[in-house]
Amino acid sequence: MISNLSKVLNSNVKRMYTTAKNLESVVIVSAVRTPIGSIGGSLSTIPGTKLSSITIEEAVKRAGIKPSDVDEAIIGNVISANLGQAPARQCALGAGLEQKTITTTINKVCSSGMKAIVFGAQSIALGHSKTVVAGGFESMSQVPYYADKMRFGAKYGNQTFIDGLVRDGLADAYNGSAMGVCGDDCADKYKITREQQDKFAVDSYLRALEAQKNGFFNDEIVQVPIVGRGGKVTYVVEDEEPKKVLFDKIPNLKPAFTPNGTVTPANASKLNDGASSVILMSESHAKELGLKPLARIIGYADAEQAPIEFPTAPALAIPKALKNAGINMSQVDLFEINEAFAVVGLANAKILDIDHNKLNVNGGAVALGHPIGSSGCRIVVTLTHLLQNKNLKYGVAAICNGGGGSTALVLEKL
C-alpha cells in the first residue's frame, strides 16, 4: 500500500514539474471597458453585474470567438453586498456565456480586476483552460447601507446605519481610518507637497480631457445603453468625471481626511461605477483559431507591506513582475499605475525613478474615476490599447490595494 502511494505521489510530482516546464504563453485577444460613471450619475441605475455582462459580451465579440469557446470567467468585485449569489456567475450568464462556463468572483480590494487576470493567465499557462474572460466591476452607486443590529432586533435606543462603501471598500480594516489617511501618511513620509499633488491632479485631468477630445479611448470603450422614460434609449459613450473638473477651485480645497493633510477631493480618485473585461487565451490556441492577439502577458507579481503603507506597494510589486518577465525598468515604454490618490503616482514614480512622460499618459483615476473592483483590469485594458496605438513594445500596469498590497502585470505588444 505504501509502495502504491509512493508511486502515485511520484507520478503527481513528475506531472507537476512537467507542467511547470511547459507553461503555455498567455495572450490578450481583446480588451474592453465601459465608460466610467460618477457616483449617482449616468450609470448609477445599472447593476454592476450588468455592466460587467456588457463588457464580457463585447470582449467576446471583438475577439472573434463564440460564447461557447469561453471555458472560465474570473471576475473581480469588492463590495458584493446585495448583488445576489455568485456575482461572477451573474456576469457570465448575463453576457450569454454557456452554463458550462466555470465562474469565480475575486476580492483583492482595488487589485481585484488585475488579480482576476493573473488567475486567468495561470489557469491557461497550466493548461487548465484554453480561453478565459477576466475582469472586474463595481457599482459604487448601488452599494447599500448596513443595518447590523437588525438580525436579532434592536433592544433599546437609536440605531445607526453603516455605509457599505466605507466599511468594506474604503476604510482600513485594522484601525478604521479612511484610505486617504494612508495617503496623507505617504505624502509626509516621502515629502510630497500639496502643490505637487495638485499639479499631478491637474495634469491627470488635462491628459484625460485631451484623450477624450482626440478619441484615444474609443478603441477600449463599449457604449452602455440607458433605457429612460417611455422606453427611450440613450447611450453613455465617455467617462463622466473629466469634464466636471473646476480647475480654479483645486488650490483652495480643504484637506479631505486629516486636518493638516494634503489629500483633497481633487487630488484623490472619485467614487464611480464601471466594468472592464479581457479575453485571455493560450498563444497556441489563438494561432489555431487564426486570431491576432493584442499583447502577451510576460510577467506578474504581488507584494504586501504594512496596511498603512499600501500606497507604495506597487514599488515592491513592479520590480518583482519585471524580474519574472525578464526585462528591466529601462525597457518599459509605458506605465499605468492606478491613481487612488495623486500621491500614489508621485510616490511610486519617486521610488522607482519613473519618467512622468511614461506614466498614465491618458490620465488616471484622479481624473477618470476609480470603480474599485474594475480598476485593476481597466488599467490593463488602457495599457493594452496604448501599446497598440503608439506602437510601443513593453508596458507595466500596477495597482495598490487596501491592507498593504499590490498587483503588477507586464505586457508585450504583439
UniProtKB/Swiss-Prot annotation:
Entry GO CC: cytosol; mitochondrion; peroxisome
Disulfide bonds: none
Positions bound to CoA: Y205, K244, V245, L246, K249, S269
Taxonomic superkingdom: Eukaryota
Gene3D superfamilies: 3.40.47.10
Protein name: Probable acetyl-CoA acetyltransferase
Top-rank EC class of the record's enzyme: transferase
Species this protein is from: Dictyostelium discoideum (Social amoeba)
Protein keywords: Acyltransferase, Metal-binding, Potassium, Transferase
Family as reported in the entry's similarity comment: Belongs to the thiolase-like superfamily. Thiolase family.
NCBIfam families, sorted: AcCoA-C-Actrans
EC number assigned by the record: 2.3.1.9
Binding site for K(+): Y205, A266, A268, V366
Pfam families referenced in this protein's UniProt entry, alphabetically: Thiolase_C, Thiolase_N
